[in-house]
């Protein structure tokens, strides 16, 4: 029982709401609104990794249901396209999300993995590193 409690106390549980990431294509779309209250308010997790890389994800208003001190990782950088996002647009979107959840509980990441399946996405290794460099640059500016 002692070791079980130790593990439970140190275990971090996160949820990634994935909309598909097969060879640069998605298989699901839609805003978080229909599931937000139950998912964000009742699920017993430490953080959410959420896809917000395009209009199919909807707006940030559902984040108002994130309960307690849960963290939200905003997947604002797409892994489906090699085109780099505009830095200021991403920064503006982070601040828009901060209207619903405090900035100190928000984080930035790519919307999903670069190779969520064996085939991977239509990005070169250099393009992937450029995306990660952009994440780092934006994070250093927003959370200085």
PLM regions and their residue ranges:
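Ligand-binding pockets and gating/stacking loops
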Residues: 27-31
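Catalytic-face loop-and-helix region of soluble metabolic enzyme cores
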Residues: 20, 34-144
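Aromatic-lined carbohydrate-recognition surfaces of secreted/lumenal glycan-active proteins
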Residues: 11-22
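Short, small-residue-biased leader/transition segments that mark boundaries at the very start
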Residues: 1-7
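Secondary-structure boundary elements
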Residues: 7-12, 141-144
């Amino acid at each position: 029982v002692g070791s079980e409690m130790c593990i439970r106390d140190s275990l971090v549980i996160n949820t990634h709401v994935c909309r598909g990431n097969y060879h640069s294509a998605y298989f699901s779309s839609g805003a978080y609104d229909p599931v937000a209250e139950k998912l964000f308010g009742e699920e017993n997790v430490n953080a959410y990794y959420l896809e917000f890389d395009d209009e199919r994800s909807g707006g940030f208003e559902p984040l108002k249901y994130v309960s307690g001190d849960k963290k939200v990782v905003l997947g604002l950088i797409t892994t489906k396209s090699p085109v780099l996002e505009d830095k200021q647009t991403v920064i503006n979107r982070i601040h828009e999300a901060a209207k619903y959840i405090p900035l100190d509980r928000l984080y930035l990441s790519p919307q999903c993995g670069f190779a969520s399946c064996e085939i991977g996405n239509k990005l070169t290794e250099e393009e992937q590193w450029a995306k990660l460099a952009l994440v780092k640059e934006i994070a250093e500016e927003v959370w200085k």
